């Protein structure tokens, strides 16, 4: 059963990666990579400053925007437990505002929900390393738990645009 579920998720990921193929080779730009309320400050003259550049580097702007949108919708401290509906609304507002300044291409708009879902699936519960460890340890219960998380997060039909 786990193998069938894993294969389904792998096919979903492969489809998203295929759609991202042309986007991956776009120009890369310097990005902060981790803009949050704890990494920004307001100067006395009203400018916004950034610090904490541990995630800074070069990235395709679209990829950075999707990751930043996910971060804003899931990892920021809003002082309350976020529901899926609240997270989706935050993501919608982030992407609405972002696209007012830098519109997405049709290609980017088409792949964004799937890419967002994929990030969500692997970010919840630190699946990247948790799954690797569970497979190495042949921990069927942990693998099943992580596949459950991934299946809940994978639906690309969430209203984030």
Feature map (PLM): residue ranges:
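Aromatic-glycine-rich donor-binding/catalytic loop that engages nucleotide-sugar donors
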Residues: 50, 102-103
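A generic short alpha-helical patch detector that favors 3-5-residue windows
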Residues: 8, 57-60, 86
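Active-site activation/catalytic loop segments of kinase-like enzymes and analogous catalytic loops
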Residues: 62-102, 118-134
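ATP-dependent phospho-/nucleotidyl transfer catalytic cores
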Residues: 1-32, 89, 139-145
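ATP/Mg2+ or Mg2+-diphosphate-binding catalytic cores
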Residues: 122-161
């Amino acid at each position: 059963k786990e193998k069938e579920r894993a294969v389904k998720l792998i096919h979903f990921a492969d489809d998203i990666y295929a759609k991202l193929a042309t986007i991956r080779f776009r120009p890369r730009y310097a990005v902060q990579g981790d803009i949050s309320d704890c990494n920004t400050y307001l100067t006395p003259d009203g400018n916004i400053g950034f610090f904490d550049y541990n995630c800074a580097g070069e990235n395709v702007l679209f990829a950075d925007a999707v990751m930043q949108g996910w971060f804003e919708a899931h990892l920021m401290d809003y002082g309350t437990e976020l529901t899926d509906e609240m997270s989706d609304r935050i993501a919608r507002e982030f992407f609405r505002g972002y696209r007012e300044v830098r519109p997405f291409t049709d290609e980017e708009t088409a792949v964004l929900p799937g890419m967002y879902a994929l990030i969500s699936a692997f970010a919840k519960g630190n699946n990247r390393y948790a799954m690797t460890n569970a497979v190495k340890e042949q921990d069927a219960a942990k693998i099943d738990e992580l596949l459950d998380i991934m299946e809940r997060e994978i639906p690309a039909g969430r209203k984030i645009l």
